């Protein structure tokens, strides 16, 4: 059987179109909850291989200008996660299996509930097990979670999506990134987030994990507000909701909505129809959301206003990103709406 080394795996990943590959040994992830344990997917797993593809900076250009939204959903979020990145992950998994080792590609999804189903065998957890993909990437030495819990790397800052392969091949793990060597805790993400979902460090709300001798910490993000904003229930980031529901006054900052409630409301609105009238001739509750759902099966609206765009801008200005550009990203004052959907100055 042909030898397989960590270096061979990384070279094969790059040849398959991935931008980076990191490797963790299984021991680094043993402290995860049972419903997130990779060993519950593949008990013989010895190495966790993390795959990464960049989000092109230009994906955010249309939203930054306030003129074009669909690129973020297609090239920066859903289709990058469900099509472009998995191609490289699939090819790398095949390469590993050509060397005689089993390779389990894991899609970075989430369970519908935890557990989703009762155990199908005595003594094991129920379906569905989904590892924490960003924490696994930290364990594989690719980067760290920023204060917003968005994954950061030295090369791309906050601009990447992640995948995973579990294998029974024992591969040399990568060194861990030092905590806060990429995220400087500048709080730009918290200050700019349109959903008011990221706590400021002064609020002392955080999540903390230990991997070997290193402690990683990030803000305890309000996922209800985050989800409601991401999926367009917030007029501060959505001119579409402002246009199609002009009388709605929903201040997300004042809501105590759960993540599940936000999903339930958002997708009901996005896929919803009503009778056609002169005021709303299409019959869609919100036209853009329905269009994007039909085009891609997903829709994203906020464009990662604070957690990615503002973080990216600050990191680039500070010279903390290896992927450099000739021009600054933000070339004019940032557009902004209030919770009523009215245009306000920055």
Regions found by a protein language model. Give the residues of each.
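Short, solvent-exposed secondary-structure capping/transition elements
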Residues: 60-61, 104, 320
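Flexible, active-site-proximal loop/turn residues at the rims of small-molecule/cofactor binding pockets
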Residues: 27, 55, 171, 199, ...
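Short beta-strand element of the conserved SAM-dependent methyltransferase core
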Residues: 49-51, 165, 311
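C-terminal non-catalytic accessory extensions
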Residues: 307-346
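Catalytic cores of enzyme domains
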Residues: 32, 74, 78-304, 313, ...
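Non-catalytic, usually N-terminal nucleic-acid engagement modules in DNA/RNA processing proteins
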Residues: 1-90
């Amino acid at each position: 059987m042909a030898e397989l080394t960590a270096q061979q795996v990384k070279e094969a990943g790059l040849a398959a179109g991935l931008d980076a590959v990191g490797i963790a040994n299984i021991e680094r992830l043993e402290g995860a909850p049972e419903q997130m344990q990779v060993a519950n997917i593949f008990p013989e797993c010895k190495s966790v291989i993390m795959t990464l593809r960049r989000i092109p900076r230009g994906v955010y250009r249309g939203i930054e200008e306030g003129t074009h939204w669909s690129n973020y959903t297609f090239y920066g979020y859903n289709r990058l996660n469900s099509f472009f990145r998995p191609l490289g992950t699939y090819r790398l998994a095949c390469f590993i299996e050509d060397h005689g080792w089993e390779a389990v590609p894991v899609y970075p999804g989430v369970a519908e509930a935890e557990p989703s189903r009762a155990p199908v065998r005595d003594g094991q957890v129920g379906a569905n097990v989904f590892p924490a993909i960003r924490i696994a990437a930290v364990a594989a030495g690719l980067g760290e979670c920023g204060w917003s819990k968005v994954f950061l790397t030295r090369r791309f800052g906050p601009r990447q999506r992640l995948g995973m392969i579990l294998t029974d091949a024992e591969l040399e793990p990568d060194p861990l990134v030092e905590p806060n060597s990429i995220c400087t805790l500048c709080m730009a993400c918290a200050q700019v987030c349109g959903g008011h979902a990221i706590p400021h460090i002064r609020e002392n709300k955080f999540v903390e994990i230990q991997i070997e001798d290193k402690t990683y910490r990030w803000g305890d993000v309000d996922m209800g507000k985050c989800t409601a904003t991401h999926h367009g229930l917030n007029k501060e980031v959505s001119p579409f909701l402002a246009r199609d529901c002009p009388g709605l006054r929903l201040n997300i900052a004042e809501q105590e909505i759960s993540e599940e409630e936000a999903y339930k409301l958002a997708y009901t609105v996005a896929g919803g129809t009503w009778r056609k009238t002169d005021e709303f001739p299409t019959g869609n509750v919100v036209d853009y959301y329905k269009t994007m759902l039909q085009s891609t099966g997903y829709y994203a609206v906020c464009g990662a206003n604070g957690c990615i765009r503002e973080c990216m801008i600050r990191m680039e200005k500070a010279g903390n990103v290896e992927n450099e550009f000739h021009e600054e990203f933000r070339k004019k004052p940032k557009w902004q709406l209030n919770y009523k959907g009215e245009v306000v100055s920055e």
